[in-house]
Amino acid sequence: MGLWRGKSPLILASQSSARKMLLANAGLEFIAITADIDERGIQAASKLSSPRDIGLLLAREKAKAVSANHPGSHVIGADQTLALGERLFNKPAGRAQAMAQLRDLAGNYHELNSAVAVAHDGKIVFEDVSVARMTMRQMSEAELSAYLDAAGDAVTTSVGAYQLEGLGIHLFERIEGDHFTILGLPLLPLLAFLRSEQLIAV
């Protein structure tokens, strides 16, 4: 018997391999369903400027969008934003944009904001944002090119053009924050909420 005690299946509103891995490693059975939302459109319409607030808004919208079609289920939405000062980064569209992002991040400190929201019957019942502070080492053009050659198309799937669970770890000299936040899901506060609602057995 698994840990999930909800009457309806737990749903992750994401196909992120890292988020799916984190939930699976925590012993939770779940269904992964992509949230069909216009992230850029929602962000623009909101007129929010804080990376933290934008991440939380998108996590909420993902959870609510999937929840609307799955009554009774608890739906987890998550989003991650990267901020270099006041500048917000999006996933790079290709290699050239990935290189430009890495040039800006190299030798500098930035923040990863990981937001999570849980929806039930279309309403948000839990939300949280965790922050990781990241310092990327100074790198030459040759080093950045070598990284992009090795990482391939995977760089376009993450903000900042790096995946810390893979080759991206080579880019950093200092990381402050928990592993789950860096991978895009504040797992400890999420589990605490599920436990408080008696939705998990442990």
Swiss-Prot record:
It comes from Bradyrhizobium diazoefficiens (strain JCM 10833 / BCRC 13528 / IAM 13628 / NBRC 14792 / USDA 110). The active site is at D79 (proton acceptor). Coiled coil: none annotated. GO terms for biological process: nucleotide metabolic process. Keywords: Cytoplasm, Hydrolase, Nucleotide metabolism. Pfam families: Maf. GO terms for molecular function: nucleoside triphosphate diphosphatase activity. Its cofactor is a divalent metal cation. Its EC number is 3.6.1.9. The keyword Transferase does not apply. Belongs to the Maf family. The lineage of its organism: Bacteria, Pseudomonadati, Pseudomonadota, Alphaproteobacteria, Hyphomicrobiales. This is Nucleoside triphosphate pyrophosphatase. Disulfide bonds: none annotated.
